[in-house]
Regions:
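Acidic, proline/serine/threonine- and glycine-rich low-complexity intrinsically disordered segments
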Residues: 158-159
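Conserved small/polar residues in nucleotide/adenosyl-binding loops
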Residues: 162-169
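Aromatic-enriched hydrophobic runs in primary sequence
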Residues: 7, 23-31, 38, 127, ...
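N-terminal accessory alpha/beta regions
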Residues: 41-150
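N-terminal ordered "arm"
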Residues: 5-47
Length: 173
């Protein structure tokens, strides 16, 4: 994948995010960040908000078109399980689904079902910028926005956040 050059965003590393991608998580993670930043003006995002946006954006392809993202894709199973367990309409709007998911993630079983999304994606997305497989090192090194990485990872009162670089609030791809 070749992303257009930018003086604001380090597209050299962003191109590498999507190399060797075997699951859709990184795509939906990035789309979630873009949605929250561009549509809602957020630069500091609760990881659960990004995950909710991921599920909402993948909902229609999975439920309506029955698109499977492959054998190693747990997002597909999580979406179907939520739809069946909570009888969520197939044609629900993204806005209504997002609102519903915000309510549902307050339930322990839903948080447990979706928790796999926050276990790796926030860290693996930053690997092209921060060359380490140690998640703790990724958190530490992201604090200085090493190599111009897109965001830093924070944890406050057991809640994880991403915080975009200050001048990255206008993402010019």
């Amino acid at each position: 994948m070749q992303i257009p050059q930018s003086y604001i965003l380090t597209t050299k590393y962003l191109n590498r995010v999507f190399d060797k991608t075997v699951a859709t998580y990184k795509y939906y993670w990035f789309l979630g960040i873009l949605d929250l930043c561009v549509k809602h003006g957020k630069t500091r995002m609760n990881v659960w908000d990004i995950m909710i946006t991921m599920v909402a954006n993948a909902w229609y392809p999975v439920i309506y078109f029955r698109l499977s993202f492959g054998k190693s894709e747990s997002l597909y199973e999580a979406i179907w399980a939520l739809q069946k367990e909570y009888n969520i309409p197939i044609n629900i709007s993204i806005r209504d689904l997002t609102d519903l998911l915000h309510e549902l993630v307050q339930k322990a079983d839903v948080r447990k079902r979706l928790n796999f999304l926050q276990m790796n994606v926030p860290f693996r997305f930053l690997r092209p910028w921060i060359d380490t497989s140690d998640d703790r090192q990724t958190v530490v090194r992201s604090q200085s926005f090493e190599n111009g990485c897109l965001y830093k990872l924070e944890k406050h009162e057991a809640v994880s956040y991403t915080h975009l670089r200050a001048h990255e609030t206008e993402l010019h791809l």
